[in-house]
Amino acid sequence: MSESVEQHWSVYLIRNNRNALYCGVTNDIERRFKQHQLGKGAKALKGKGPLVLEWSTSFDSKVTAMRAEYFIKQLTKSKKEQLVELKALIAVDDNQQVMFESCSQS
């Protein structure tokens, strides 16, 4: 018998020593961040530490997470900074439209 394991996917933003934000997707954020810190992740982050995991959010499917990642990568730097500052949530509706909303408290 095989047991179905529910897998969550995360989209994340990592800040490097040049203050740039890198966006990625993974099914294990702790493992992936450690890989980035060890220089075994994305080429864009190699040699640019220290790295800081600034923001992340989870999705129930890889497809949805990848759609959100694409959306974030299209944002301007200032919009990505808003995601971090506001601790915003990313949502994908039934029509596969991606949006973000603030969840910070005033």
UniProtKB/Swiss-Prot annotation:
Pfam families: GIY-YIG. Residues 7-82 form the GIY-YIG domain. Gene3D superfamilies: GIY-YIG endonuclease (3.40.1440.10). PROSITE patterns: GIY_YIG (PS50164). SUPFAM superfamilies: GIY-YIG endonuclease. It comes from the Bacteria. Belongs to the UPF0213 family. This is UPF0213 protein VPA1222.
